[in-house]
């Protein structure tokens, strides 16, 4: 889902209206953060192509956007389900110990006893703390993303060590 130079930030959904607007499913928080990026990379027919954002607005739970050279619903329909990415360099620098969710997805999760629990499939925002959705062949685990639970994250080794009982 990600490459070294691009970060997936959303997906084009379906046409909206008669003038080429498109509904967007945002993977950012808040969802309208996508609108801060004037040029998007769209994965259309398995190739990345730049498209300029002409306008956008919040239409919860979606965004609706107008992209350059997409002026009618028939053209917009061809972009349904295309992924939206931005260049990784367009993301702000993070403080030590902070991570973008996209960088955690796919990492192996191991507890402090060395037992492999699975890989990070996604994250959930709950209000009190974020939660790692960790999947293995046997099951799915919901592990709180807290300073107590998360012992270490090593992006180079692609591993997260957690204080978590293998039976939970």
Curated annotation (Swiss-Prot):
Domain PRC barrel, residue spans: 95-168
Keyword entries, A-Z: Chaperone, Cytoplasm, Ribosome biogenesis, rRNA processing
Any Gene Ontology biological process: rRNA processing
GO molecular function, one term: ribosome binding
Pfam families in UniProt: PRC_RimM, RimM
GO CC term (a single one): cytoplasm
Recorded superkingdom: Bacteria
Subcellular localization: Cytoplasm
InterPro entries tied to this protein: PRC_barrel-like_sf, PRC_RimM, RimM, RimM_N, RimM_N_sf, Transl_B-barrel_sf
Main localization category: cytoplasm
Similarity section: Belongs to the RimM family.
UniProt subunit comment: Binds ribosomal protein uS19.
Cited function: An accessory protein needed during the final step in the assembly of 30S ribosomal subunit, possibly for assembly of the head region. Essential for efficient processing of 16S rRNA. May be needed both before and after RbfA during the maturation of 16S rRNA. It has affinity for free ribosomal 30S subunits but not for 70S ribosomes.
Domain description: The PRC barrel domain binds ribosomal protein uS19.
Name this protein carries in UniProt: Ribosome maturation factor RimM
Naturally occurring in which organism (per UniProt): Coxiella burnetii (strain CbuK_Q154) (Coxiella burnetii (strain Q154))
Gene behind the chain: rimM
């Amino acid at each position: 889902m990600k490459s070294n130079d691009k970060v997936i930030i959303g997906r084009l959904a379906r046409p909206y209206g008669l003038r080429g607007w498109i509904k967007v499913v945002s993977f950012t928080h808040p969802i309208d953060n996508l609108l801060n990026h004037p040029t998007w990379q769209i994965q259309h027919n398995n190739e990345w192509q730049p498209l300029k954002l002409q306008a956008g607005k919040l239409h919860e739970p979606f965004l609706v956007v107008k992209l350059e050279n997409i002026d009618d619903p028939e053209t917009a329909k061809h972009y349904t389900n295309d992924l939206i990415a931005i260049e990784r360099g367009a993301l702000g620098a993070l403080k030590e110990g902070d991570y973008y969710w996209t960088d955690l997805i796919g990492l192996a999760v191991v507890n402090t006893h060395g037992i492999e629990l699975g890989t990070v499939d996604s994250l959930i925002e709950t209000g009190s703390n974020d939660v790692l959705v960790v999947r293995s062949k046997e099951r799915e685990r919901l592990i709180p993303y807290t300073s107590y639970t998360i012992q270490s994250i090593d992006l180079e080794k692609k591993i997260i060590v957690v204080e978590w009982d293998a039976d939970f």
